């Protein structure tokens, strides 16, 4: 399969910004992060556009993924509708501004509220793509499938760099199943995650799906069973700290994210117990 996209990778968390070319449109995903990096993306878009409509898709509303929108004022902006729930995107934009302020980052454009052209509710075909809500990391996360290229841009999941960061573990498992079905049906041959390098080929994609699913199942088992059996929180937390990802101990630099997953699962388990 000939590569039909250009991938830009920020030095901040290896955040990816994909530009996917189709006959009538240019699709830009999550332009990130620092001004010089976004300027490079903008120059590429300008050189490749050739009169085509520019579609800017936000895979989700986390601050490192939305900060570059203002650099592309004539783009049609698309996101999943949950991005507007409970002032979510406003909070994330403010977080981006605080980050920039802390490191004296100056931008040539305003980091402001995007003007959305389309808000996606359910899975749907649109033009030459298929939008698929994949909540779990965030409520508003959305994957985009380019059917002809068999290319799936997923946002913050299926990364080679990190285990699942959980907002809703049940929804996350369901989202993995949605993507797995697409792969098994032969509709996806390459996945671009929000951080890290793409997964190419059925075997690699399914491996990433399975290791993420196993982490979620193991994590849920420790916490949900512990809460159901009235095990002391300290004991459950100690068991949780011993969990592995893909057979390897959790990296120290990701330990805080692992702990945040534990806290989220405690909330879910307590809510389920009632």
Task: Please place each PLM-identified region on the residue numbering.
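Active-site environment of divalent metal-dependent phosphoester hydrolases
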Residues: 34-36, 61-67, 84-86, 139-141, ...
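Divalent-metal (often Zn2+) His-rich catalytic cores of metallo-beta-lactamase-fold enzymes
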Residues: 173-235
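Short, solvent-exposed loop/turn segments at secondary-structure boundaries
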Residues: 33, 91, 163-167, 204-205
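Conserved beta-strand hairpin/beta-sheet module of binuclear metal-dependent hydrolase folds
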Residues: 1-49, 143-156
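C-terminal regulatory/interaction regions
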Residues: 225-274
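Active-site HxH/HxHxD metal-binding segment of metal-dependent hydrolases
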Residues: 38-39, 43-122
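Active-site neighborhood of phospho(di)ester-bond hydrolases with catalytic His/Asp-centered motifs
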Residues: 29-32, 53-64, 78-81, 133-136, ...
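Core dinuclear metal-dependent hydrolase active-site scaffold
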Residues: 19, 121-146
């Amino acid at each position: 399969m000939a590569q039909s996209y250009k991938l830009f990778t920020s030095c901040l968390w290896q955040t990816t910004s994909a530009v996917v070319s189709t006959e009538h449109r240019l699709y830009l995903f999550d332009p990130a992060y620092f001004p010089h990096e976004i300027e490079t993306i903008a120059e590429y878009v300008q050189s490749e556009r050739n009169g085509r409509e520019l579609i800017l898709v936000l895979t989700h509303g986390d601050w490192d993924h939305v900060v570059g929108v203002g650099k592309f004022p004539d783009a049609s902006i698309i996101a999943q509708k949950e991005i507007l729930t409970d002032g979510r995107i406003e909070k994330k934009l403010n977080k981006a501004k605080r980050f920039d302020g802390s490191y004296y980052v100056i931008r040539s454009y305003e980091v402001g509220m995007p003007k959305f052209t389309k808000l996606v509710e359910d899975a749907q075909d649109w033009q030459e793509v298929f939008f698929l809500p994949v909540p779990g990391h965030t409520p508003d996360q959305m994957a985009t499938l380019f059917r002809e290229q068999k290319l799936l841009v997923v946002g913050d999941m299926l990364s080679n760099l990190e285990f699942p960061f959980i907002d809703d573990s049940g929804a996350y498992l369901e989202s993995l199943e949605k993507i797995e079905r697409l792969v098994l049906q032969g509709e996806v041959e390459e996945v671009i995650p929000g951080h890290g390098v793409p997964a190419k080929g059925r075997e690699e994609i399914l491996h990433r799906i399975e290791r993420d699913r196993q982490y979620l199942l193991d994590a849920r088992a420790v916490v949900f069973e512990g809460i159901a059996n009235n095990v002391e929180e300290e004991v459950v937390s100690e068991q949780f700290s011993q969990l592995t990802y893909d057979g390897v101990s959790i990296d120290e630099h990701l330990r805080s994210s692992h702990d945040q997953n534990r806290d989220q699962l405690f909330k879910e388990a307590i809510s389920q117990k009632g």
